[in-house]
């Protein structure tokens, strides 16, 4: 059981999760010409909040997560809501390759900083996107480690220019980025610190 299995049951109770997802989804809809013929993959979907916001703009979304408890939460939400164009996939894309499927759009938010080999996962995204399709990544700008605190083994955000270069290296074009949200996070009893979130968009030529 990983840390996200433990957090799954209370994940949707955090209003920041919803506010952040809505800000990111709205910016995606503004910048990418989504349509009802497009299939999408949300990588590291969590409880699927972003996909639920984007579902009416796309033909179908596959909600992928390697946390079985998060997937159970999504399955339950899909069942209760009666939504027909969302489906879940309990899969670890870091460790395995997804075979015989392609998407027109891959997106993720606040996931990349948990990924060990960022260039490897971007390459996998490229291999999974149809020509003309899009990639959208929302995550933290480089920060001093305060966001997660001691013991975190992932990335303390990203240098946006270096990440853009990595995305370009894997074959994407039309790369653009902008700030899309600010998380005001309590990092101690007396200190609340702002952490800016970027959205980077790229296209598979």
How does the language model describe each region?
Residues 41-95:
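Class I SAM-dependent methyltransferase SAM/SAH-binding core
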Residues 107:
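A conserved beta-strand element that flanks and buttresses the S-adenosyl-L-methionine
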Residues 183-205:
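Core SAM-dependent methyltransferase catalytic element
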Residues 110-114:
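Short catalytic micro-motifs in class I SAM-dependent methyltransferases
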Residues 172-183:
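Conserved S-adenosyl-L-methionine
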Residues 146-162:
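Acceptor-substrate binding/catalytic loop of class I
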Residues 1-35, 73, 80-81:
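Conserved class I S-adenosyl-L-methionine
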Residues 119-134:
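A short glycine-rich, Lys/Arg-flanked "PGG" loop and its adjoining helix->strand segment in the class I
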């Amino acid at each position: 059981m990983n840390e996200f299995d433990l957090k799954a049951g209370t994940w949707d109770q955090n209003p920041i999760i919803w506010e952040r997802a809505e800000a990111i989804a709205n910016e995606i809809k503004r910048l990418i010409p989504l349509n009802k013929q497009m299939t999408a993959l949300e990588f590291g979907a969590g409880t699927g909040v972003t996909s639920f916001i984007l579902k009416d703009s796309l033909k179908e979304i596959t909600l992928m997560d390697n946390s079985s408890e998060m997937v159970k939460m999504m399955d339950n939400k899909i069942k209760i809501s009666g939504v027909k164009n969302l489906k879940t996939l309990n899969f670890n894309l870091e460790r395995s390759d997804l075979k015989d499927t392609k998407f027109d759009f891959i997106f993720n938010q606040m996931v990349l900083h948990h990924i060990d080999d960022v260039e490897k996962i971007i390459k996998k995204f490229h291999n999974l996107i149809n020509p003309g399709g899009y990639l959208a990544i929302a995550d933290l700008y480089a920060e001093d480690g305060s966001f997660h605190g001691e013991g975190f083994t992932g990335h303390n955000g990203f240098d946006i220019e270096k990440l853009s270069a990595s995305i370009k290296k894997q074959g994407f074009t039309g790369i653009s980025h902008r700030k899309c949200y600010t998380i005001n996070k309590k990092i101690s009893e007396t200190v609340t610190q702002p952490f800016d979130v970027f959205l980077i968009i790229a296209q598979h030529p």
